[in-house]
Swiss-Prot record:
<dbReference type="GO" id="GO:0005634">
    <property type="term" value="C:nucleus"/>
</dbReference>
<dbReference type="GO" id="GO:0061608">
    <property type="term" value="F:nuclear import signal receptor activity"/>
</dbReference>
<keyword id="KW-0963">Cytoplasm</keyword>
<comment type="subunit">
    <text>Found in a cytosolic complex with ASF1 (ASF1A or ASF1B) and histones H3 and H4.</text>
</comment>
<dbReference type="GO" id="GO:0005737">
    <property type="term" value="C:cytoplasm"/>
</dbReference>
<dbReference type="GO" id="GO:0000785">
    <property type="term" value="C:chromatin"/>
</dbReference>
<dbReference type="InterPro" id="IPR040122">
    <property type="entry name" value="Importin_beta"/>
</dbReference>
<dbReference type="GO" id="GO:0042254">
    <property type="term" value="P:ribosome biogenesis"/>
</dbReference>
<protein>
    <recommendedName>
        <fullName>Importin-4</fullName>
    </recommendedName>
</protein>
<feature type="repeat" description="HEAT 3">
    <location>
        <begin position="431"/>
        <end position="471"/>
    </location>
</feature>
<dbReference type="Pfam" id="PF03810">
    <property type="entry name" value="IBN_N"/>
</dbReference>
<keyword id="KW-0813">Transport</keyword>
<dbReference type="InterPro" id="IPR011989">
    <property type="entry name" value="ARM-like"/>
</dbReference>
<dbReference type="InterPro" id="IPR001494">
    <property type="entry name" value="Importin-beta_N"/>
</dbReference>
<feature type="repeat" description="HEAT 1">
    <location>
        <begin position="348"/>
        <end position="385"/>
    </location>
</feature>
<keyword id="KW-0653">Protein transport</keyword>
<feature type="repeat" description="HEAT 4">
    <location>
        <begin position="475"/>
        <end position="513"/>
    </location>
</feature>
Length: 1082
């Protein structure tokens, strides 16, 4: 085919005439099937006079070669390689140079360094050229090729860093700077430790280069900022010596209102990431105050004259109704503060932020006050524990006062803050319901039902507060339900109905069975919404599905008669409505129903799992982002015959190789769908057990693939579901066989899941994912027991992983700084350690005390160092609690650790904080129980602590733990050494008030007394009868405890009749008669 004929067709495609473009497209698709078309394209990319035709030819050539390179004759390959390099050197139009560089990258991937030495020669020559346009082309080519195949350049990292140190030194040529930064973006993550000093030299040059690019091209500057992100993300401390300079640059750009918002937002995103990965370095270099001083004016910025922030506009856009949905510098500045709260110790952040916060809230400027409430909202997320313990009431009063602010924008922010407080400060905030609920109800009634924008904000705060109230919601239930049912029964906007349906779900979560009087009305309304075909009600339908699932969980058995109808409703909607949110909410409904129906859901599982597997596999919503011109995608000209031929070709090249795709964007709804699908599958597998087995293999494989998903929440949900699958398989194997170890499916699943969990803890960068993995790991160990510790060596691997978390040596922990000078940690860090700590006692119980003891010895110093006087309350509580539960798991093997544990637990039993005291006393009790002779030596000192403490202790849980500890001491005391006054003191302190689990211990004591020395209870008969009369009607007391006490009393009645009847006489008549009847003495 002649180049001129092909060129004419390509020209037709550039005309603004739809019909001519259609005909030319058909011609082109036909021509490109002819092998002779390729040489014509080669000729055009080098010689066509029109730059658009040259670019067209380069892109089409690249797409043709993706799967056909090896089919070209060797001389054709060599000819094209030479032609492309020549064309690159001659080309003067930048867009064509980019396409030629991309074509070169495709060829390079096929040939490699060895197969194309001329390419490396050109790179070497052009990137070091003194002629700037030639150097720019060389760096363009380098950036594209290194991005395309970074592993090919690993051996040349040092030379590349040296080159970039040179090219970034001259700020005269923006193109050279831009492509130098793009190259750095591609190689930064591969920098080796011995090149750190060279990489550090680049940081000031990167900042200077960015400063040079910003006034010239903000779009390119945004793209070039990725180099900074990559340098921050590497585990090596490249940025640290220049952290102040980088921070100053970012803040300068963020504050500069003359610059475009996309660039300022992009820089604030970079700052957010910097805070996340360099929080300790920020503290060490005293950079937090200047950062906050720069952020507050950004957060308080007033929008342009006559405008409002997006979330304050009376817009019909539901996404802007609640919280921080805007894409402005203001909203991203708040996110930086959120990240500071998550990653800095509150003791270090709050002294800096609180004075600025108070000043903002006192300001006459409503935007200053708004900023104050937004900061309060995000502080409750990262510094929640600190606020709960020290600041909750005064801050809550400030927020409540904000609901009466004269400015609507401030009231909006106060509602958002109250919603965040309600979400993050549980359970403490619920104790203020008598103050908060009347305010919220009053505010809700003051908003006109038609004003859905403000109504949404009020409902957000109300829902978050109400759903955690439990029984405390009952006084407000009639008023709440009247508010919610009124717009549902009467004509109102669809959005108003959606908000009311959502609020009913939150109310149901709190009210539980108290909602039953309203249930028939609610169900009639939800049915109506779910069966309507009206398009305006689509979002009401979605919310109705979600609320139906909440009702199934809240009302339990009362909902059971409707379970099958709900199942059919959900399936019908999924089949007839193609919408990710409908599917997501339906799957959550199925999960809730599985809790009611159990294996009764079995007949529906084929349809349910088919739908869910389609959701897991779907690539819907995933949109490729192309570097080239999108119209070139029209010419994906492989005919069906060619595709079949390629499938048969043994030498077929990689299918997925498309250098035109620069990345993917995914609509959030589809990520949410995958996340909720995983969550629902995990729950359904647990609840339906054996009925789920036929679907286990397919669902397991699809969920496992999502461990590689780029979206954090999907990965988190996938890890959780895999753990639930293992637990479900264990449960099913117990049902079908007495020995779960005989289940090959369970063994295979554990063999895949446990290594995946350990790998995730080590390399996953997102803390919420790691916390979920640790929690799931603990659950699998607890359920599957020793099977989860196969093969041999697994116990050691698991202990090493947990130890890495405690030592802050995992990828998600900021541990590159020295921690010696400061033991404070962010609450987010502490939560991660707690999740690891919870696995240690479970490991001990699973492995067996004697097998675990050597590993516990390595955990012990890491836990003991968190019990020092200088540690925070949260750290002490965590460490002491972990030690206490580990002693239980170790059993008799704990005897060898008594000398190290007893003094620490004794000291912490005197702590001011009741939670620390409670944990320490529990630990002393279990150490007394299991510690054998070494522990018995400490009994006099232990009783010397516990008995006086019981007399003055005012916290119910601590008193209950003292009772449990005394019971354990009595059972563990050497025969004949039990002191009667200890037993009498213990019995006088009963019944337990809060820690009901300790009734098991008290029950064991009653059995122990009956079996070993029943005579000693004669003197305390009246106390035993008093306790019995109180606990017999209490359903919270374990039946075994009641039975053990009745046995003791029966012994008394038979062997010491006088003492028994004297004691019985001290009870009220009705109690005495009830007791005699239960003992068969009447």
């Amino acid at each position: 085919m002649e180049p001129a004929g092909l060129e004419q067709i390509l020209k037709e495609l550039l005309l603004p005439d739809t019909e001519r473009i259609r005909r030319a497209t058909e011609q082109l698709q036909t021509i490109l099937r002819d092998p002779a078309a390729l040489p014509a394209l080669f000729d055009l990319l080098a010689t066509a006079t029109d730059s658009q035709i040259r670019q067209f030819a380069a892109v089409l050539t690249r797409r043709r070669l993706n799967n056909r390179w090896r089919r070209l004759a060797p001389e054709q390959r060599e000819s094209l390689k030479s032609l492309v390099l020549t064309a690159l050197q001659k080309e003067t139009v930048h867009s064509v140079s980019v396409s030629l560089a991309q074509l070169s990258a495709t060829i390079f991937r096929k040939e490699g360094l060895q197969g194309w030495p001329q390419f490396m020669n050109l790179l070497q020559h052009s990137t070091h050229s003194s002629h700037s346009p030639e150097k720019e082309v060389g760096l363009l080519l380098l950036s594209v090729v290194v991005s395309s195949q970074p592993e090919a350049f690993h051996a040349h990292q040092h030379e590349l860093l040296q080159l970039l140190n040179e090219t970034l030194s001259d700020v005269s040529f923006p193109g050279v700077l831009f492509y130098s930064l793009r190259t750095l973006t591609a190689i930064a993550r591969y920098v080796r430790p011995d090149d750190v000093s060279l990489a550090r030299m680049l940081v000031p040059k990167v900042v200077t280069a960015l400063r040079t690019l910003i006034p010239l091209d903000e779009v390119k500057a945004c793209e070039a900022l990725e180099a900074l992100d990559e340098m921050l993300e590497t585990e090596l401390p490249i940025i640290n010596p220049h952290l102040s300079e980088v921070l100053t640059f970012c803040l300068e750009v963020a504050k500069n209102v003359a610059l475009g918002e996309p660039l300022r937002v992009r820089v604030l995103c970079c700052l957010t990431f910097l805070v996340k990965v360099k929080s300790k370095a920020l503290l060490k270099n005293r950079l937090v105050p200047p950062l906050l001083h720069a952020l507050f004016p950004l957060m308080a910025a007033e929008p342009p004259m006559g405008q409002l922030d997006p979330e304050d506009q009376d817009s019909d856009d539901d996404d802007l109704e609640i919280g921080l949905m805007g894409e402005t510098p203001k909203h991203f500045a708040v996110q930086v503060v959120d990240m500071l709260a998550l990653h800095l110790p509150p003791e270090k952040l709050c002294p800096h932020v609180m004075p600025m916060l108070e000043e903002a809230l006192r300001s006459e400027d409503p935007y200053q006050r708004k900023a104050g409430f937004l900061v309060l909202a995000v502080l409750s997320d990262g510094a929640g524990d600190h606020i709960r313990q020290r600041l909750l009431y005064p801050l809550l009063q400030i927020v409540c006062k904000g609901l009466d602010d004269p400015s609507q924008i401030v009231r909006n922010a106060a509602l958002f803050a109250l919603g965040q407080f309600s979400e993050n400060l549980q359970p403490h905030i619920s104790s203020y319901s008598e103050e908060v609920m009347p305010l919220l109800l009053s505010y809700l009634k003051s908003v006109p039902m038609g004003n859905t924008h403000h109504l949404a904000k009020a409902c957000y705060a109300l829902e978050n507060f109400v759903e955690n109230l439990g029984p405390k919601v009952q006084p407000y239930l009639p008023e709440l339900m009247e508010c919610m049912l009124q717009p549902l029964k009467n004509p109102s906007k669809a959005r108003t109905k959606e908000l009311a349906v959502s609020a009913i779900g939150a109310i149901a979560t709190a009210a539980q069975d108290s909602l039953l009087p309203y249930f028939p009305t609610i169900m009639d309304l939800l049915r109506e919404f779910l069966l309507t075909g009206h398009e305006d009600f689509h979002l009401v339908q979605i919310q109705s599905l979600e609320t139906l699932g909440v009702l199934a969980r809240a009302l339990g058995e009362s909902m059971k008669p409707l379970a099958e109808e709900c199942c059919q409703l959900g399936l019908g909607l999924c089949i007839h409505i193609d919408d990710p949110d409908v599917r997501r909410c339906t799957y959550s409904l199925f999960a809730a129903l599985s809790g009611l129906m159990g294996e009764g859901l079995g007949p529906y599982l084929p349809q349910i799992t088919t739908l869910m597997l389609l959701s897991l596999r779907s690539t819907e919503g995933i949109v490729p982002q192309y570097d080239g011109i999108s119209s070139f995608l029209l010419f994906d000209d492989d005919s069906e015959a060619e595709e079949e031929e390629e499938l048969m070709d043994e030498d077929m090249e990689e299918e997925g190789d498309d250098s035109e795709i620069s990345g993917y964007s995914v609509e959030n709804a589809f990520f949410d769908e995958k996340e909720d699908t995983c969550t629902a599958l995990g729950e359904i597998s647990m609840n339906t057990c054996v009925a789920f087995l036929p679907f286990m293999d397919a669902t397991f494989d699809e969920v496992y693939k999502l461990l590689e998903c780029p979206h954090m929440n999907v990965r988190k949900s996938a890890y959780e579901a895999l753990g639930q699958f293992c637990c479900a398989l264990h449960k099913a194997s117990q049902r079908s066989s007495s020995d779960p170890s005989s289940s090959p499916v369970l063994q295979t699943s554990l063999a895949r899941v446990m290594p995946a969990y350990m790998q995730a803890v080590k390399v996953e960068r997102e803390r919420p994912v790691v916390m979920a993995v640790l929690e799931s790991l603990t659950g699998v160990l607890r359920t599957c027991g020793s099977l989860a510790l196969q093969p041999p060596g697994r116990l050691s691997e698991l202990c090493n992983v947990l130890k890495a978390v405690l030592q802050k040596k995992t990828a998600c922990q900021d541990a590159e700084e020295d921690d010696d000078e400061d033991d404070d940690q962010a609450e987010y860090d502490a939560m991660l350690l707690e999740h690891a700590g919870e696995a240690i006692p479970v490991l001990a119980a699973t492995a067996g005390g004697h097998a675990f003891a050597p590993f516990f010895a390595t955990f012990l110093p890491l836990l003991l160092c968190k019990t020092k006087q200088s540690c925070t309350v949260a750290e002490k509580s965590f460490a002491v609690g972990t030690l206490a539960e580990s002693i239980q798991g170790l059993g008799t093997a704990s005897a060898q650790f008594v000398s190290r544990l007893f003094p620490v637990l004794l000291n912490n039993a005197r702590e001011a904080d009741p939670e620390v005291r409670s944990n320490a006393i529990f630990g002393l009790g279990v150490l007394a129980e299991h510690g054998g002779c070494p522990a018995q030596d400490h009994f006099p000192k232990l009783l010397g602590l516990l008995l006086p403490l019981l007399a003055r202790e005012r916290h119910d849980r601590v008193r209950d733990n003292i009772c449990g500890a005394l019971a354990r001491v009595l059972m563990a005391s050497p025969v004949g050494k039990t002191e009667p006054q200890v037993l009498a003191t213990l019995l006088r302190a009963l019944p337990l008030k809060e820690d009901m689990e300790e009734w098991l211990t008290i029950g064991h004591l009653f059995s122990f007394l009956h079996q070993n020395n029943p005579e000693q209870v004669v003197d305390v008969a009246s106390e035993l009868l008093r306790i019995c009369s109180l606990i017999l009607p209490d359903n919270r007391i374990p039946p075994d405890t009641k039975a053990a006490l009745l046995l003791l009393l029966t012994f008394l009645a038979k062997q010491h009749t006088d003492s028994f009847h004297t004691a019985l006489g001290s009870l009220p008549n009705d109690k005495a008669q009830e007791l005699q009847a239960m003992m068969g003495l009447t």
